[in-house]
Amino acid sequence: EIRLSLVGSEMCIRDSMEHLQVEAVPDIYVSENGYKVILQGRGLGAIIGRRGETLDAIQQLTNYAVNHGQSKRVRIHIDAEGYRAKREESLQRLAVKVAGKVVKYRKNMTLEPMNAYERHVIHAALQDYPNVTTYSTGVEPNRRTVVAYAPGQK
């Protein structure tokens, strides 16, 4: 079953690359809860897309294709050019910058719409930030994180 998942994920990813007309080679590694796929090649910006939306879509489709009809779920994590780590660092910097402004001006700030994972990164980055709290508002796909002034909050 695991071998079938591996073959299925590689086929799905290669089909996506062909459809996007991008030459990329998937390097697949076994991780603790599934597979990690690192895409290697040139011009991977088309695979990443705006704020990682295309990469997220490829990952979601691959997970669906591999797990459809299977009794045991396997998680496929896909990255290209280290995008996911770079995005996480960028979100953490944004969170701290916004929190500083919120405390300085004592006024809440609402961030741009983000997916659930990106909102989680913001919440986690600020969980111990003094005088600030975070919460999400709105409905997908326009759900946003609010960084709120909360005096005395730790």
PLM feature segments, named:
Residues E1-G8, C12:
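Single conserved hydrophobic/aromatic residue that forms the stacking wall/gate
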Residues V22-V37:
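Short edge beta-strands and adjacent turn/loop segments
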Residues E10, R14-E18, V22-V25, A46:
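Internal active-site segments that recognize and position negatively charged phosphoryl groups
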Residues R3, G34-Y35, Q40-R42, R50-E53, ...:
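Intrinsic disorder
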